[in-house]
Amino acid sequence: MITETAAEPTVPAVPAAEEATEARGREEPAWPWKDAPIRTLVQRIHQLQAERAQGFRRLEEWLAPVQGLRAWGRGLRVPTCRRGHRQYLRSGPDYDFARYRSTVHGVTQAFAAASREVLAVEAELGGPRRQPLLAGHVRSLQELEQTRLGTVALLQLMETPELAGQEDAVRMQQLKMKVIKTMEAISEVLQDLRFDAESAE
């Protein structure tokens, strides 16, 4: 499973998204890891994964205590993306949509920034570095994260009060299992990436 400890603090982060938006109209700065060793690129991928995990935790702060919560949190023992949505649904009947939208927007921007950087690492590994195996791992990681995000979003949608009565328990269980399997696959890809990167250097 992916945890916050997967990140190694030895690699500096890319300038924040706020700094990038302030620089509109100016030429975009050079990518800071252009000539970095492969090991550093792999460490950065792990840091980006930790940032994604943090984004999922922010979404968790907005989920409702619907009946499926116990099965989701305890029975399956999965890090969920539910707290954010829980807070939103608890704010009903006069839902605090503006705050929820703000949280989702912030998380979406963080995910988009992480995705852009992951794609840049993939291009660097697949192009100038001539490491197609490592680039393939990075691409797989990106695809798995897209699957995870889409599945979590669908789960959140299915748990809204308006749809809770129409909830299909079997479908919910399938989606929860899909999240688990996707997270396991992400962990495997990260391990393969680290192992193959050590062999490449």
From Swiss-Prot:
Report the leader peptide range.
none
Q: Where is this region: Disordered?
A: 1-28
Q: InterPro entries recorded for this chain?
A: REX1-B
Identify one Pfam family in the record.
DNA_repr_REX1B
Task: Report biased composition (Low complexity) as residue ranges.
Answer: 1-18
Q: Which cysteines are joined by disulfide bonds?
A: none
Q: Which PANTHER family match?
A: REQUIRED FOR EXCISION 1-B DOMAIN-CONTAINING PROTEIN
Q: What is this protein called?
A: Required for excision 1-B domain-containing protein
* Top-level taxonomy: Eukaryota, Metazoa, Chordata, Craniata, Vertebrata
